[in-house]
Amino acid sequence: MGIKTYKPKTSSLRYKTTLSFDDLSKGNDPLKSLTKGKKFKSGRDSSGRISIRRRGGGHKRKYRLIDFNRRDKFSIPARVASIEYDPNRSANIALLVYKDGEKRYIISPKGIKVGDVLESGPNAPIKIGNALPLENIPIGRTVHNIELNVGKGGQLIRSAGGYAMILASDGNYVTVKLSSGEMRLIFKKCIATIGEIGNEDYANISIGKAGKSRWLGRRPKVRGVAMNPVDHPHGGGEGKTSGGRHPVSPWGQPTKGYKTRKKKRYSDKFIIKRRNK
């Protein structure tokens, strides 16, 4: 997908860029049976208190039900019926029509087009968009939508432009290099989809104006130094101040490089190399 720029008729359009939707199927509303209503919580938890700040408002959305698993469709070919926009994620989605008549959405890989035939299973051909166990994917291939637990469905590499690379296979585990630089062992029976995720230009768009952030449900971010002492550790002082201490969160936890990962996690033994800083 290309990037669309605007003539600066107003100051808010000067730096605004959006994605052009030329690659998407024309005139396709989301399949009603694969959508459901999405209730926005405005960052509140079950007790009504703010648990995630700066959330609220935004345009209404229908949630698209995505098949991250594809295990129950092993060896059943599916035709790509359309490639559609999904407001709930950065990647586009593809509508598959299986040979048995069932329809499902998957994350759209880079390079597939309407009419392509995809398949999942241990014996599926090595082709972009096909889902196979990691042990059946050749070393050096890029993959996405990777399972961490057999049968749970893909959890890693699901956003636009994302991919991981198969580096090695030894015993029951396959070494995978994630796009962050982290190298990780994943059980060889876990499923991954071959190829990169499409819509890679998503990372290059410029919002351009505050109003678009509001359309997306993002509210303004107030600096701690602009608050009162009761609201933030950086608050208060006479006139403009620097905060007077090393940067911390509103609850006093150090920020900007402070490691928050627990020292002893069960998954540490699967991480060969931590992500790049």
Swiss-Prot record:
One of its GO terms (molecular function) is structural constituent of ribosome. One of 8 loci used for multilocus sequence typing (MLST) in Borrelia burgdorferi. The keyword Ubl conjugation does not apply. Residues 258-277 have a biased composition (Basic residues). Residues 32-58, 225-277 are annotated as: Disordered. Keywords: Ribonucleoprotein, Ribosomal protein, RNA-binding, rRNA-binding. It comes from the Bacteria. One of its GO terms (biological process) is cytoplasmic translation. Pfam families: Ribosomal_L2, Ribosomal_L2_C. SUPFAM superfamilies: Nucleic acid-binding proteins, Translation proteins SH3-like domain. PANTHER family: LARGE RIBOSOMAL SUBUNIT PROTEIN UL2M (PTHR13691:SF5), RIBOSOMAL PROTEIN L2 (PTHR13691). Belongs to the universal ribosomal protein uL2 family. Part of the 50S ribosomal subunit. Forms a bridge to the 30S subunit in the 70S ribosome. One of the primary rRNA binding proteins. Required for association of the 30S and 50S subunits to form the 70S ribosome, for tRNA binding and peptide bond formation. It has been suggested to have peptidyltransferase activity; this is somewhat controversial. Makes several contacts with the 16S rRNA in the 70S ribosome. This is Large ribosomal subunit protein uL2.
